[in-house]
From Swiss-Prot:
Name of the gene encoding the protein in the UniProt record: rpsU
Keyword Calcium: no
Cellular component terms per the entry's GO annotation: ribonucleoprotein complex; ribosome
Protein name: Small ribosomal subunit protein bS21
Organism: Rhodospirillum rubrum (strain ATCC 11170 / ATH 1.1.1 / DSM 467 / LMG 4362 / NCIMB 8255 / S1)
UniProt cross-references to Pfam families, sorted A to Z: Ribosomal_S21
Annotated TM spans: none
Annotated family: Belongs to the bacterial ribosomal protein bS21 family.
GO molecular function, a single term: structural constituent of ribosome
InterPro entries associated with the record: Ribosomal_bS21, Ribosomal_bS21_CS, Ribosomal_bS21_sf
HAMAP family from the UniProt entry: Ribosomal_bS21
BP terms from Gene Ontology: translation
Length: 80
């Protein structure tokens, strides 16, 4: 088993390498990879149906949040 992920349709197969039968460490690595790839967030969003209007509103709010964060970081870099 490789350490990367392979794309299958829309989902990515997340794989971790178990070394020296250290399952706890492998689980920790798996959880970290899944967190990074947004699997838990996706599961939470898909738990209930989201109306298209709600989805648009959520995505717009996320875009605004991202833009504000980028602006804040840009100003911080420039020393304001």
């Amino acid at each position: 088993m490789g350490g990367g992920s392979q794309v299958e349709g829309e989902r990515a197969l997340v794989q971790v390498l178990v070394r020296d039968n250290n399952v706890d460490q492998a689980l920790k690595a798996l959880k970290k990879k899944m967190q990074r790839e947004g699997v838990f967030r996706e599961m939470k969003l898909r738990r209930n149906f989201e109306k298209p209007s709600e989805k648009r509103a959520r995505e717009k709010a996320e875009a605004v949040r991202r833009a504000r964060k980028l602006e804040r970081k840009r100003l911080e870099r420039e020393g304001f």
